[in-house]
Design a protein with these regions (language model features):
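Nucleotide/phosphate-binding catalytic cleft detector across ATP-hydrolyzing
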Residues: 2-42, 46-172
Length: 174
């Protein structure tokens, strides 16, 4: 673990790009010393940016009635709710359920016959300016961002056992 006092950040939002990138550089430098190798990609936790989650349902009409892998990928990329949240960017889309005709829930829709495919998913959104500013400060350190996560989500996942993650649990982050 590389640690350094954070500067240029207030309530999870960038207030000074150069101060923040300097803090990140020093923390990464210490982590590289401890690890014994160079770091080029990072995962970034977000505490600011007014994150929220929304459960959505997206539908796709299947052209030849047989669901293909490409149909599933198209549905995973589809974000029909984006227009509702103009200043926000989707950082995560976690599938809850796939449904074919007659609202039949299926585990794996690939190869099944249906005219439609529906995906119910939990989507996580964060203010796009917060993402852009954090990404810029990280890129100033010659690093690239692999993925963004919201801190409560990561904290919650880290405290659950496999059964709780699979079956569902309520986590209260105070």
């Amino acid at each position: 673990f590389g640690q350094h006092i954070s500067m240029g950040l207030n309530k999870g939002e960038v207030t000074d790009l150069l101060k923040l990138s300097n803090s990140i550089s020093k923390a990464v430098e210490k982590a590289e010393e401890m690890a014994g190798f160079r770091i080029s990609k990072v995962n970034c936790n977000i505490t600011g940016g007014s994150p929220f989650t929304k459960i959505t349902s997206d539908n796709l009409k299947i052209s030849n009635e047989i669901i293909k892998k490409d149909d599933v990928f198209s549905l995973l990329k589809l974000d029909t709710s984006k227009s509702n949240y103009k200043e926000y960017i989707q950082i995560r889309k976690r599938p809850k359920a796939f449904k074919i005709e007659n609202d039949q829930v299926v585990d794996n829709p690939i190869g099944l016959k249906s005219n439609t495919l529906t995906l119910e998913a939990t989507n996580t959104y964060v203010n796009e300016n917060v993402i852009a500013n954090l990404k810029k400060s990280i890129e100033l350190c010659h690093l690239s961002v692999n993925k963004f996560y919201i801190t409560p989500e990561v904290n919650g996942i880290s405290t659950m056992i496999k059964e709780e993650r699979d079956l569902g649990a309520i986590i209260i982050d105070i």
